[in-house]
Amino acid sequence: MNINEVINYAKGXNLDTIEALLILELILKTKKELIIANIKKSLTKKEKKLFFDQIDKIEKGIPIHYILQKKEFMGIEFSLNKHVLIPRFDTECLAEEALIQIQQNGFKKILDLCCGSGCIGLSIAYYIRKKVILSDISTKALQIVEKNTKKLKLEKFVEIIHSNLLKCIKGKLDIIITNPPYLNKEELEIKNKIKKEPTKALLGFGKDGLNISRKILNQAKEKLSPNGLIIIESAPWQIKSLKDFAIKKGFSHLKTIYDLEKRARALILGQRDDTSIRNCTFNQDK
């Protein structure tokens, strides 16, 4: 079989051409542009076996990005493995909003909480060259953060802390950006049949999946500076409940962030109702 034929085979297994080329890049250790240029080239027996083995894994529900061990986020390639969630395009809206708030407000103490692969915090450090703290309860996740930090040459801008939420974070914070686990058990059962991603990074506990998010907000009230912000992601259907809880705890709801499909994806919450203290304009979203 030649390259074109195995790509067509992959399409029959519900992969698109780009995904098939990414697998071929991994196997042939050749850039996809060169692979395309040699589309009629025959594969060796070993290469074909490796390719079909990867297709078999994907058909069994293993995400392609765990096979590739990489995923692009905010225009940056991040290494990953089965111990961290695969960065989502939807989450880029958090990182983009965080960049705006950090620059407009001159925030210096920045935390990416429940950081996973580090894609949010490292993207911030990469683009604005400010120090960012990245924290997670999973030591295996933090090993990936360390790998990505070195890969991006961001060592002098990054502090990595092993912590159960905010327990081991010292001092006041200007901004917390967090994409915590927020699935409930029912959602997790459905998702795990498809995605095979780490339960610890997905399960938010509680009937509504928001127990961890509520713990974060409870702890953040004491850890944020007087003018501090928290940007917290959730599922679209959870946003109202999370906002109501935050307001009861004394946060001001400054903005709801929407993804490109116009779904409510995250909240920006502040310590004070007086938004004029910040050097930016928020669109109030009641």
From Swiss-Prot:
Substrate binds at residues 179-182. S-adenosyl-L-methionine binds at residues 136, 179. GO terms for molecular function: nucleic acid binding; protein-(glutamine-N5) methyltransferase activity; protein-glutamine N-methyltransferase activity. Its EC number is 2.1.1.297. Keywords: Methyltransferase, S-adenosyl-L-methionine, Transferase. It holds the Pfam family MTS. GO terms for biological process: methylation. It catalyses: L-glutaminyl-[peptide chain release factor] + S-adenosyl-L-methionine = N(5)-methyl-L-glutaminyl-[peptide chain release factor] + S-adenosyl-L-homocysteine + H(+). It comes from the Bacteria. NCBIfam families: hemK_fam, RF_mod_PrmC. PANTHER family: HEMK METHYLTRANSFERASE, MTRF1L RELEASE FACTOR GLUTAMINE METHYLTRANSFERASE. Belongs to the protein N5-glutamine methyltransferase family. PrmC subfamily. Methylates the class 1 translation termination release factors RF1/PrfA and RF2/PrfB on the glutamine residue of the universally conserved GGQ motif. This is Release factor glutamine methyltransferase.
